[in-house]
Amino acid sequence: MRSFILACADRVVEGATLGAEEALRLAEARGADLHLLFAEASRIRQHFTGNSASLCSIINAKSGRCAENCAFCAQSAAHKTDAQVYPLVDEEEIVRCARDAERNGARCYGIVTSGTGIRPGAELETICNSLRRIRSETAIAPSCSLGILDEETARLLKDAGMVTYHHNLETSRSFFPSICSSHDYEQDVETIRAVKRAGVRVCCGGIFGLGESFGQRIEMTETLRELDVDSVPLNFLNPVEGTRLEKADFLTPLECLKTIAIYRFMLPGKSLSVCGGRETNLRELQSWIFLAGASGMMTGNYLTTLGRKPEQDHQMLADLGMGVGGCS
């Protein structure tokens, strides 16, 4: 296994593309071989993306009563949870939170809303006005996560100042029906394609620990590679009481790190950011995400769960000898 890991890493650094079968074999690493896998993933990261980390923050700008039935989501109307329910916050609140995110060291700021998608009207106007102000009043790069989107709306948001559009596939095509039946996987794929046609950067990844196999995690890397997304958020399930997956087990820290490492081998030049579930799944090994190939993380709170203080994340990066890079 040791020689196979080293050979795969060398090939990736030289520009080769690994296949799913090779990734599955890498995922068999255990013990000292697993530590070598992490080290080589970190070498690939430094070769392609350098030794700085991108930091992003989000605002839950509209919460709850989502018509989708995603098994993991506290905001789904199909679940009974303690998640807050409120309409779209006003422009002032969106801009205020952008300033707070910038002050806390984030370089990217996501406006996230619950629901299947957004249509022309007052909500879209509020978001566009907020984007214009964020671009003129701060140096932070704004992104949006508004659900399923068409090309025309993507262009409107881009013209208002949106730099990146975030839309997760959540999991592989083969496992998706086990997680969500309220829309089709192809609608998510078409959203990514529409955003790319509009000339907007794409942030697209998923969530792990839903019951998928490791092979299905690798399957998603192939879809992400085919779509040529720009950055990939990696989330780890933090089970919420009242959701369909409330009794799911947390992934072990080493399982999370192995997933990050395999994603770095498969998507060597992409920004890989660890987001939701970092604290609860990785626990004392949070700093290892970068030693396993990640190149960024979300800082501050998540949509419906708490994160940790931004100062702790900055100290972690300083302890690792890493700087903070731009939005990637």
From Swiss-Prot:
Positions binding [4Fe-4S] cluster in this chain are: C66, C70, C73
Alphabetized Pfam families for the sequence: BATS, Radical_SAM
Q: Which cofactor does it need?
A: [4Fe-4S] cluster; [2Fe-2S] cluster
| Note accompanying the cofactor annotation | Binds 1 [4Fe-4S] cluster. The cluster is coordinated with 3 cysteines and an exchangeable S-adenosyl-L-methionine.
Q: What does the record give as the reaction this protein catalyses?
A: (4R,5S)-dethiobiotin + (sulfur carrier)-SH + 2 reduced [2Fe-2S]-[ferredoxin] + 2 S-adenosyl-L-methionine = (sulfur carrier)-H + biotin + 2 5'-deoxyadenosine + 2 L-methionine + 2 oxidized [2Fe-2S]-[ferredoxin]
Q: Which GO terms describe its molecular function?
A: 2 iron, 2 sulfur cluster binding; 4 iron, 4 sulfur cluster binding; biotin synthase activity; iron ion binding
One Gene Ontology term of the biological-process aspect is:
biotin biosynthetic process
Which positions fall inside the Radical SAM core domain?
48-278
Q: Which UniProt keywords apply?
A: 2Fe-2S, 4Fe-4S, Biotin biosynthesis, Iron, Iron-sulfur, Metal-binding, S-adenosyl-L-methionine, Transferase
Q: Which InterPro entries match?
A: Aldolase_TIM, BATS_dom, Biotin_synth/BioAB, Biotin_synthase, Elp3/MiaA/NifB-like_rSAM, rSAM
Pathway membership: Cofactor biosynthesis; biotin biosynthesis; biotin from 7,8-diaminononanoate: step 2/2
PANTHER family noted in UniProt? BIOTIN SYNTHASE, BIOTIN SYNTHASE, MITOCHONDRIAL
* UniProt xrefs under NCBIfam families: bioB
Functional description taken from the UniProt entry: Catalyzes the conversion of dethiobiotin (DTB) to biotin by the insertion of a sulfur atom into dethiobiotin via a radical-based mechanism.
Spell out the protein name for this chain: Biotin synthase
Q: What is the originating organism of this protein?
A: Pelobacter propionicus (strain DSM 2379 / NBRC 103807 / OttBd1)
What is this protein's gene name? bioB
